[in-house]
């Protein structure tokens, strides 16, 4: 059995708490190097930088007493409103039940010495974002996740940035709305979509 655990920020194994998913032993399909990375610097930075000699993949998870695991999303995309760490998956699981919403992406925006949650939605062809849908989304998120998960802003966009293998890229959106540098733009299938997220009036107040 591969030595999977969940670590705290201090590198301690934790149970029934949310933290970083790690693996303390080799496992099948585990890469041992990157292409064009002769010194192994990128490889080490990607998987072994956070905890010395322990594989860290960047998943925010919880290890349960019965041996099961719950994955809450990417740890680099977790939300921290009021200093409380929240997983994005808890919000997505609510939104996917709304037929009016085709796709969504949720990020944290630095705001007033804190972080506020921003939800971007791509609506289905027959729908347009309105006050009724916003109200229903917030109500369901509040009841099925928690009051802390409720977005401060819900904004309609035409598309969502994704990698060439189809994964949505929360960190690229977060960096865009905060005016930070976007890493690995070349890995995006639709980088021009990020222009829509720049200087949005709704994020100025």
Regions found by a protein language model. Give the residues of each.
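Conserved ATP/PPi-binding loop(s) of AMP-dependent carboxylate-activating enzymes
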Residues: 10-48, 86, 181
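Short arginine-rich
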Residues: 175-181
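Short, acidic, Ser/Thr-enriched surface-loop or helix-capping motifs
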Residues: 8-9, 16, 63-64, 162-163
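AMP-binding/adenylate-forming catalytic core of the ANL superfamily
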Residues: 27, 32, 41, 45, ...
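General small-molecule cofactor/ligand-binding pocket signal
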Residues: 154-157
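Conserved small/polar residues in nucleotide/adenosyl-binding loops
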Residues: 1-5
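Linear-motif-rich, low-complexity cytosolic tails and juxtamembrane regions
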Residues: 201-205
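Glycine-rich, charged/polar anion/phosphate-binding loops
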Residues: 7-11, 105
């Amino acid at each position: 059995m591969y030595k999977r655990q969940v670590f705290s920020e201090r590198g301690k194994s934790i149970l029934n708490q949310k933290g970083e998913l790690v693996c303390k032993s080799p496992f099948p399909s585990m890469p041992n190097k990157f292409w064009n990375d002769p010194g192994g610097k990128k490889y080490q930075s990607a998987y072994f930088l956070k905890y010395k000699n322990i594989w860290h993949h960047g998943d925010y998870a919880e290890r349960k007493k019965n041996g099961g695991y719950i994955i809450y999303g990417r740890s680099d995309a977790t939300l921290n409103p009021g200093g409380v760490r929240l997983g994005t998956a808890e919000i997505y699981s609510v939104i996917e039940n709304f037929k009016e919403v085709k796709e969504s992406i949720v990020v944290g925006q630095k705001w007033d010495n804190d972080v506020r949650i921003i939800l971007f939605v791509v609506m289905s062809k027959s729908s347009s974002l309105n006050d009724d849908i916003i109200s229903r989304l917030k109500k369901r998120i509040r009841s099925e996740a928690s009051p802390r998960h409720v977005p401060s802003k819900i904004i309609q966009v035409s598309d969502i940035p994704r990698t060439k293998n189809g994964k949505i890229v929360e960190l690229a959106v977060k960096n865009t709305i905060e005016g930070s540098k976007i890493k690995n733009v070349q890995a995006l299938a639709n980088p021009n979509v990020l222009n829509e997220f720049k200087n949005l009036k709704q994020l100025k107040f």
